[in-house]
From Swiss-Prot:
This is NAD(P)H-quinone oxidoreductase subunit 4L, chloroplastic. NDH shuttles electrons from NAD(P)H:plastoquinone, via FMN and iron-sulfur (Fe-S) centers, to quinones in the photosynthetic chain and possibly in a chloroplast respiratory chain. The immediate electron acceptor for the enzyme in this species is believed to be plastoquinone. Couples the redox reaction to proton translocation, and thus conserves the redox energy in a proton gradient. Pfam families: Oxidored_q2. The gene is ndhE. GO terms for biological process: ATP synthesis coupled electron transport; photosynthesis, light reaction. Its EC number is 7.1.1.-. Its main location: plastid. The lineage of its organism: Eukaryota, Viridiplantae, Streptophyta, Embryophyta, Tracheophyta. It comes from Cucumis sativus.
Amino acid sequence: MLEHVLIISAYLFSIGIYGLITSRNMVRALMCLELILNAVNMNFVTFSDFFDSRQLKGNIFSIFVIAIAAAEAAIGPAILSSIYRNRKSTRINQSNLLNK
């Protein structure tokens, strides 16, 4: 069972990294970042259960990561809509806000 969960987590992480590297759209990059965070959470919970099932350190840490992901999921689209209003595009290479 441990191997199956770790393989699924590795696939999710790999898909997220590939999508984050190759995506040119910010919405797609945010979704890939969520995939990466979910894969990390799966690893935390799996290793916490495998190594010491009496202590809940991995589970608690995954709850913190879920809270951070929820904040990112709430703030990210707001930032994206602001960038879209100003630049009329959500492409990553056109979103340099330092120069106008």
